[in-house]
Amino acid sequence: MLSPKRTRFRKQHRGRMKGISHRGNQICFGRYALQALEPAWITSRQIEAGRRAMSRNVRRGGQIWVRIFPDKPVTVRPTETRMGSGKGSPEYWVAVVKPGKIVYEMGGVAENIARKAISIAASKMPIRTQFIISG
């Protein structure tokens, strides 16, 4: 699972996901990519599940790049706990993804293989996505 080695602060505010992604919205490394179409928090488990599904599909020869990193801690309070007494402890990490953000990139394979692998990875994501080709 992906997570930061160390952070400056243990806990973060939830924040708001306004607007579109202005950075990380171009294909940089591969030829094919999976682009987010709606805003969401994507957990490190979801990122890893998508990566595994893609790598299992392309086997050798293909290269995969994960363009998002879960750097935001999400805190969860223990069950059956009364209100108050501080914020919960960090449970898992999420990547904040806005519309337009490239999630995965792929290269070194034929388009039909890439399309199949990326569609399997897209089914693991909690958002609508699209397959794009660098032109």
Curated annotation (Swiss-Prot):
Keyword line: Chloroplast, Plastid, Ribonucleoprotein, Ribosomal protein
Annotated localization: Plastid, Chloroplast
Main location as per UniProt: plastid
Molecular functions (GO terms): rRNA binding; structural constituent of ribosome
Pfam family, one: Ribosomal_L16
Subunit structure: Part of the 50S ribosomal subunit.
Family: Belongs to the universal ribosomal protein uL16 family.
Protein name (database record): Large ribosomal subunit protein uL16c
Gene designation: rpl16
